[in-house]
């Protein structure tokens, strides 16, 4: 646990297995079947409850068919909490407060009142591909009422913690009954996810 450069050096030079707690580039994916009110409440909590923790959502992925019904109220709520919102070009006309996102934003753990939003045009498979490419393997959530989409997401996102209709900030050892956590392992090898004394 620590800064990226420290962790990468330890991993590179270590002669033994290292349990690493890397960046928390967490995603919340809003599927077109999701309930707008739930999406607003969960998404705002996932970012703004504590913006500086590793379980905070850094990128919202939203189905193109959910933009009109879901996104305006989410943007309004985030604006009220002084969150800077960076979006792809197609969304800029939704609100004058929005800023243009760069490709670097998809790789960024802000740890601040900043969030990026990307439109998903080809459904859950595209969302999973984005997460597995840009994410850090920490925590990712899907907001959906579609069982097939949920099952696909939970089975294919390659992260230590995957969630359904839940804030990514729920990712904590205490919440899972592990007691106080040492960190959240983003390793492929076990232990993976929240690591408490028992897992160590």
Predicted regions and their residues:
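Active-site phosphate-binding strand-loop segment of PLP-dependent enzymes
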Residues: 1-2
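ALDH superfamily catalytic-core signature
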Residues: 7-112, 164
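Conserved C-terminal structural/oligomerization subdomain of aldehyde/semialdehyde dehydrogenase
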Residues: 102-200
């Amino acid at each position: 646990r620590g800064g990226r450069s420290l962790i990468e050096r330890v991993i590179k030079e270590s002669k033994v297995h290292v349990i690493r707690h890397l960046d928390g580039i967490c995603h919340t994916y809003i599927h077109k079947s999701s309930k707008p009110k739930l999406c607003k409440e969960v998404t705002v909590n996932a970012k703004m409850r504590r913006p500086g923790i590793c379980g905070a959502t850094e990128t919202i992925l939203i189905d193109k068919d959910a933009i009109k019904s879901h996104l305006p109220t989410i943007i309004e709520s985030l604006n009220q909490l002084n969150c800077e919102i960076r979006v792809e070009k197609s969304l800029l006309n939704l609100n004058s407060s929005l800023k243009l996102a760069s490709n670097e934003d998809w790789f960024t753990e802000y740890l601040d009142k900043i969030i990026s939003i990307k439109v998903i045009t080809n459904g859950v498979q595209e969302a999973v591909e984005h997460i597995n490419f840009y994410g850090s393997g920490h925590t990712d959530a899907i907001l959906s009422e579609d069982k097939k989409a949920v099952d696909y997401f939970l089975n294919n996102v390659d992260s230590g913690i995957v969630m359904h209709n839940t804030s990514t900030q729920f990712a904590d050892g205490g919440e899972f009954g592990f007691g106080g956590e040492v960190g959240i392992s983003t390793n492929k090898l076990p232990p993976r996810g929240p690591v408490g004394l028992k897992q160590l």
